[in-house]
C-alpha cells in the first residue's frame, strides 16, 4: 500500500478521451444533435445531415485543434500550455485507439451525410470541406506545426 502517493496523471487532458464511457457518450451526443436538427420542421433530411456534419466538425476543430493548454494547473513546467488538446491526447503518441476513434468518427459521419444528401454537389462540397478541416490537423506530420504561425502562442 502506497500511503500519500497520488494516483493522478501529470496532465489530465492526456487520458480524458480514454475514460469509461467516453466514446459512447460522444456517439450519443452526435446522435442527439442529429435528432434535434431533424426535429426542426423547416429542415429537410439532407440539410439536417449536412448541419450535423458541419456542427460536429466545427466543434471537433475548436475543442481538439484550436484551443490550447489545459484547464488544470499541471506540474509539467508549462509544456501543455503550447499544445492543442489533440497534441496532448495520449501524451502525443500517434495511432492509439482514442486517436483512431476520433479520426474515424468524422469520416463515418461524412459518409452518412453524403449518402443521405444523395451526393448533391452543394452538400457534398460543404461536407468535404468540413471533413478536410478536421482531418488535416490530425495528420501525424502536422503534430506541433502551426501553419502561417496561426495559433502559435
UniProtKB/Swiss-Prot annotation:
GO BP field:
ceramide metabolic process; intracellular sphingolipid homeostasis; motor behavior; myelination; negative regulation of ceramide biosynthetic process; sphingolipid biosynthetic process; sphingomyelin biosynthetic process
Q: Output the Pfam families linked to this UniProt entry.
A: ORMDL
Would I find Transmembrane helix among this entry's keywords? Answer: yes
Membrane topology reported for the UniProt record: Multi-pass membrane protein
| Protein origin, superkingdom | Eukaryota
Kindly list the residue ranges recorded as spanning the membrane. 27-46, 47-64, 101-121, 124-140
Write out the tissue specificity statement of the associated record. Widely expressed. Expressed in adult and fetal heart, brain, lung, liver, skeletal muscle and kidney. Expressed in adult pancreas and placenta and in fetal spleen abd thymus. Expressed at intermediate level in pancreas, placenta and brain but low in skeletal muscle and lung.
Q: What is this protein called?
A: ORM1-like protein 1
The domain section of the record reads: Ceramides bind to ORMDL3 N-terminus and stabilize it in a conformation that physically restricts the accessibility of the substrates to their binding sites in the serine palmitoyltransferase (SPT) complex, hence inhibiting SPT catalytic activity. In the absence of ceramides, the N-terminus is flexible and permits substrate binding, thus liberating SPT from inhibition.
Location in or out of the cell: Endoplasmic reticulum membrane
The entry describes its oligomerization and partners as: Ceramide-sensitive subunit of the serine palmitoyltransferase (SPT) complex, which is also composed of SPTLC1, SPTLC2/3 and SPTSSA/B.
Key words of the record:
Endoplasmic reticulum, Membrane, Transmembrane, Transmembrane helix
Species of origin: Homo sapiens (Human)
Q: Which residues lie on this side of the membrane: Cytoplasmic?
A: 1-26, 65-100, 141-153
Q: Which GO terms describe its cellular component?
A: endoplasmic reticulum; endoplasmic reticulum membrane; serine palmitoyltransferase complex
What the record says about family reads: Belongs to the ORM family.
- Functional description taken from the UniProt entry: Plays an essential role in the homeostatic regulation of sphingolipid de novo biosynthesis by modulating the activity of the serine palmitoyltransferase (SPT) in response to ceramide levels. When complexed to SPT, the binding of ceramides to its N-terminus stabilizes a conformation that block SPT substrate entry, hence preventing SPT catalytic activity. Through this mechanism, maintains ceramide levels at sufficient concentrations for the production of complex sphingolipids, but which prevents the accumulation of ceramides to levels that trigger apoptosis.
Gene responsible for this protein: ORMDL1
Entry annotated with the keyword Ion transport: no
Q: Which residues lie on this side of the membrane: Extracellular?
A: 122-123
